[in-house]
C-alpha cells in the first residue's frame, strides 16, 4: 500500500512539472522506485524455477537496495566502488551476485522513471488533442479474428523480423532526442556498458545465470521505443508526408520524435522518398505486429509488395545506420504459403462449397471456393520447447523432472497442471486438437514419472496405487468446464467441440515455453 500511494502521488503531479524539468533524474535516488522495480522484475521470474534458487528473499533484497542508495548518495561511482565496498560485510566482486543484482536494480529503476515520464507526456498529448486513449491490454487471441476477416481476401503476405540495432549506442541516440539531462545520459551509457560486460562474461554460478535470463523491464521499454521508431514508415505514408492529421496515427506522436525524423529523412534520401509515396498507395494493405515479428499483407501485386520491402530496407538503413539484408523479408502468395505468427502456423485454405440449384425442370450444381484462415499449433516447436525445459526428450518421450522432487505432491501436481492449462488455453485456437492431446499426454506422464521418482517407485505401481483418475481430473479441468458451457447453450455442437477453435479474451502475452522456440 505504501508503494502504491507513493507512485500514485507521482502520477498526480501537474503536467507543468514534467515539462519544466528536463528529466526526472532526482527521482532516481528514491527507494520506492527500486522496490517497485524489484516487485515487477523478480516476482515474474521463470515460472518453473523456485525463487529460492536465486538466494535472496524480500527482506535481503531491500537491504541490498538501501546499500546501493547509500553508496549513490555518497557520490561514489558505481564502477569505482566495486573494490572498496566491503565495509558492509559483503563483496561486490564483478562476478558476484551482489554486483549483478546492483546493476539490474539500477537499470530497473531507470526503466520505471522512463515509463513514468513518457506515459505522462503521451497522456497529456492525447488529452490536448482530444484523442481517445486505446486499450493496450488487448487479448492476443483477438488478432486472429482480424486476420481471418482480412487475410482471406488478400493476395500476398510478407513476414518480417524487425531488425535489432547492431550497437547499443543507436538506442542511446534515439533516447537522447527526449532526454536532455546530461547526468541521465551518462547513467544510460553506464547501464549499456554494464549490460555489455554482463553478456560478454557470464559466470558459471546458477544464481547469476538465472538472474541474467530475466528479461529486464528497462530493455523491454527500449525495445518498444525502438519498434515504434521502425513503424514510423506507416505514419509517414498515411497522409503522404503530412504532419499527422489523422486520429489513428496520433497515438504514436509522443512515442517518436516525428518532426526531427521528417527533416532528417529529407536530407538523407533527397527527393526519392517523395517520389515513391504516390506509388505505394494501397487501401487494402494491413499490418500486424507482436514484439519483433510483423505481418504485412496486401491485395495488390507482387511488384507493389516488392516496393514495400525495399522501402523498409532503405528506411532502416538511412535512419538507424545499419545494413539490413533484403532477402530476410519473404513475400509469398497467400493460398500457397503458411507463415508462423504468435505461436501458430497460419495459412489460407480454399474451402469448396457445392450448392444444387433447380430452376423449373432443370437442376445444376454451383461450385464456389471460399478462403478460410486455418491456424495450427506447431507440434515440433512445442516438443522442442518442452525438451529444452527438460519435460521430455527431443522425440517427445516423457521424462521425470528431478529438480522438482523436493517439492510436495500438491505443488508438483499444481505446477504441471498450470503449465498444461496455459498451453491448452493459448493454443485452443488450433484446428487440429490432437496436437494439444499429445502435449497433455507428455505433461501428464512427466508428472507421473516425477511423482514416482520422488516416492522411489515405478510409474505403473504409482498409477495402480492412486488410480489414473488422480491425474485425469486435474488435467481435464478446462475441457470439463468448456463442455458444461457448450452443453448449457448449444448442446447440438458438443460433438464438434474437439474441432472448434476457441479464443480467450484474457491472454495478453505468449506463454513462457513458446519463448524457448
Curated annotation (Swiss-Prot):
Principal localisation: plastid
GO terms, biological process: mRNA processing; RNA splicing; tRNA processing
Keywords: Chloroplast, mRNA processing, Plastid, RNA-binding, tRNA processing
One of the record's GO cellular component terms: chloroplast
Pfam family, one: MatK_N
Molecular-function GO terms, alphabetical: RNA binding
Alphabetized InterPro entries for the sequence: Domain_X (IPR024937), Maturase_MatK (IPR002866), Maturase_MatK_N (IPR024942)
Keyword hit for RNA-binding: yes
Cellular compartment(s): Plastid, Chloroplast
Recorded family membership: Belongs to the intron maturase 2 family. MatK subfamily.
Job of this protein: Usually encoded in the trnK tRNA gene intron. Probably assists in splicing its own and other chloroplast group II introns.
Protein name stated in the entry: Maturase K
Organism phylogeny: Eukaryota, Viridiplantae, Streptophyta, Embryophyta, Tracheophyta
